[in-house]
Amino acid sequence: MQTRNTFSWIREEITRSISVSLMIYIITWASISSAYPIFAQQNYENPREATGRIVCANCHLANKPVDIEVPQTVLPDTVFEAVVKIPYDMQLKQVLANGKKGALNVGAVLILPEGFELAPPDRISPEMKEKIGNLSFQNYRPNKKNILVIGPVPGQKYSEITFPILAPDPATNKDVHFLKYPIYVGGNRGRGQIYPDGSKSNNTVYNATAGGIISKILRKEKGGYEITIVDASNERQVIDIIPRGLELLVSEGESIKLDQPLTSNPNVGGFGQGDAEIVLQDPLRVQGLLFFLGSVVLAQIFLVLKKKQFEKVQLSEMNF
């Protein structure tokens, strides 16, 4: 009987621990993942629109810089680095989903030419692995190995993200050719302002949905506000809900206009996109170029030697 009670107690403790862990995970994930690459994966078949705009800009409304560094040329079946830089002021804090202030996270999407893909672990050098750190990249879609996403990850540690890329080999992939190819990148720091369903996050400005007099501002128990606006012309009441974490710019009794900001803008992040070009070089072409350059150098040497020989002959004839 005692043994049965012991097993029952252990089972209850395990169940409680799992439940608590799941709750912590859900709360943590909800607070950091707003409008990161996973939203693009869920809602867009291709992250780059026909206009060239990367869809992350639909949720991250502020425009911020991003940069990418890749080699000018690569040889087939070789691994190279694509370094994405997402600069921002490390002292900045953002509003989290729970209304508190926290550090910024970053995310990126890298759109490679067809045939280029994430390098397998056994092809990555120790030096490159050290630059990559603990990052875990994933394909945008199982059938789109040339589109890679990462994030959210801590911005203070990964404001520069190194992607290990494997160049294709036209000898084994007939759809790939020795050409110059474009590479596109999008990078964000901080949370987005709009969710994919069109609703606002608490990381943006909230405007008045009606004009009139603010008759009441109610501070909610779990954070945030309810602002009651009364239209003086018809006494109609409108209640605007302000989520937690935002700073009000208005007060009771104040007269406001339609679309007037009720809060300050908390957003300190933003999204940017860029591009680069890379040449998939034919090794035979490189060998041919080296042979040509070698021939030119040899020709120059022979000309110099011939000139010196001619000068010696002229000098000997003059002495004779």
Swiss-Prot record:
Gene: petA
Listed InterPro entries: Cyt-f_TM (IPR024058), Cyt_f (IPR002325), Cyt_f_lg_dom (IPR024094), Cyt_f_lg_dom_sf (IPR036826), Rudment_hybrid_motif (IPR011054)
Membrane topology annotation: Single-pass membrane protein
Presence of keyword Plastid: yes
Binding site for heme: 36, 56, 59-60
Cellular localisation: Plastid, Chloroplast thylakoid membrane
GO biological process: photosynthesis
Keywords carried by this UniProt record: Chloroplast, Electron transport, Heme, Iron, Membrane, Metal-binding, Photosynthesis, Plastid, Signal, Thylakoid, Transmembrane, Transmembrane helix, Transport
Gene Ontology CC annotations of this record: chloroplast thylakoid membrane
HAMAP family xref list: Cytb6_f_cytF (MF_00610)
One example GO MF annotation: heme binding
Signal peptide: 1-35
Name assigned to this protein: Cytochrome f
Domain of life per record: Eukaryota
Family classification: Belongs to the cytochrome f family.
